[in-house]
Amino acid sequence: MDNTLQRLQNAELEILDEIMRICDANDIHFVMMGGTCLGAIRHKGFIPWDDDIDVGMYREDYNRFKEICKKELDSKYFFQDFDTEKNCGFIFGKIRKNNTYMVEEYAKEIEMHKGIWIDIFPFDYVNDDFTVFQKEYKKLLFLRNLFIVKQGFKVKHDAPIAVKISYSMVRCIRGLLSASSLKNKMMKLMTKYDDTKTNTMFPYGCAWKEKELISKDEFFDTIRVDFEGRKVPVFRSYDKYLTSLYKDYMTPPPIEKRNSGHDLRNVKFDKEN
């Protein structure tokens, strides 16, 4: 395995251990998502070529975790979201490792913490009617894109043409609303059903879109499985979850598609940001 990828995975495991320490000590429900869940089930650890870890939390737990981090998070790390760092354009959180460097191309010019990270996605209750959910999700995506452009983030170079066109359109109206107004509108929309508690939950910041919809019962029902020598929580219904995301998830992709998701050439370990 490439030494940089191995070192990156080890750094992320350190961050994961810190997240788990805080969650377990404070009875915070969390779960492995996406490729991290797949890696745990298929490889009992990282997918060999994977370079990130994704964690999910119910919004209420996410907010509690965020508050606890102010006092209990080890000084080696930093909790980042659009509240803790004004230039942040993400609608989810990250735990970053201080004195390291890893940045995605679209955020390269943004003045913010750029340490090695783990993503933490808050799950919110959403409308049980899929048609209504889709309308509200599209509205959220529009606001998110407007917010990202407002913060100075660039569109990914490999984004679909439709996405690039939408970003171009958004740039034309980015001056109509302030960043704080956009944050308030997004938060109001994302947490719209959190008090009424529907039967469906969703992580608005995720990459898999509607495929990540999950029932309330399935979200809170987890089991612990092996992951790089530690036990991590995954959905008990992981077969249903992973099939939705990857279909035949136990069959690895062809060799030519086994690529790291990020450019690892500029990753720095134990360096000042």
Q: Can you describe what each PLM-predicted range is?
A:
Residues 20-53, 62-63, 217, 244-245:
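Active-site nucleotide-donor binding segment shared across nucleotidyl transfer reactions
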Residues 143:
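Helical lid/core segments from catalytic subdomains that handle acyl or acyl-like groups
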Residues 137-140:
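Short, His- and charge-rich active-site/binding loops that engage polyanionic ligands
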Residues 130-135:
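A short secondary-structure junction signal
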Residues 53-54, 230:
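Short active-site oxyanion
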Residues 1-24, 69-128, 148-245, 252-273:
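Conserved catalytic core of two-metal-ion nucleotidyltransferases
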Residues 65-67:
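Conserved SAM-binding loop
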Residues 56-58:
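Short hydrophobic/aromatic beta-strand micro-patches
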